[in-house]
A protein has these predicted regions:
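Active-site loop of short-chain dehydrogenase/reductase
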Residues: 8, 56-57, 84-85, 130-142
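Conserved glycine-rich cofactor-binding loop
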Residues: 9, 16-17, 40
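Conserved glycine-rich Rossmann-like NAD(P)H-binding loop of the short-chain dehydrogenase/reductase
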Residues: 30-46
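The beta1-alpha1 cofactor-binding region of Rossmann-like NAD(H)/NADP(H)-dependent oxidoreductases
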Residues: 41, 62-74, 105
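Substrate-binding pocket helix/loop in short-chain dehydrogenase/reductase
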Residues: 99-100, 107-112
């Protein structure tokens, strides 16, 4: 286990698979307490359990980043669990399901809402916690 993130609490959106899950594992290996957030609870809990099985500290908190109330509740749960938030890794998002020339505007709007508005909601909700922690970091994936 590393020490670069020892004592830090990191929220990772889209933490139930892919880059988010791998980032959660890496942060935990560096000593962070990891809060994985995603909509798919079963997958997210499996990743959290895997991190804990490997000697790290992780919890899963269900969250739809495109829903302001869901984000507010999830961030407060994260802060209550470990008393602080030091890092936000905005990773939740996705692409359209159809090819560009055929993409309906509704699909485009859904992608924009999750990928951009969700990043805004999360960053805004976490910001006061970063200030209270004396600083921190927000990382936005694209």
């Amino acid at each position: 286990m590393g020490e670069r993130l020892k004592g830090k609490v990191a929220i990772i959106t889209g933490g139930n698979s892919g880059i988010g899950a791998s980032t959660g594992q890496l942060f935990a290996k560096e000593g962070a307490r990891v809060v994985l957030m995603a909509r798919r609870e079963e997958q997210g809990q499996m990743v959290a359990n895997s991190i804990c099985d490997d000697g790290g500290e992780a919890i899963f908190v269900g969250c739809d980043v495109g829903d302001h109330d869901s984000v507010s509740r999830a961030v407060e749960k994260a802060a209550a669990a470990w008393g602080r938030i030091d890092l936000l890794f905005n990773n939740a998002g996705g692409g359209a399901g159809s090819s560009f020339p055929d993409e309906p505007i509704e699909e485009w709007q859904r992608v924009i809402h999750t990928n951009l508005t969700g990043t805004f909601f999360m960053s805004q909700a976490v910001w006061p916690h970063l200030v209270n922690a004396g600083g921190g970091a927000v990382v936005n994936m694209s």
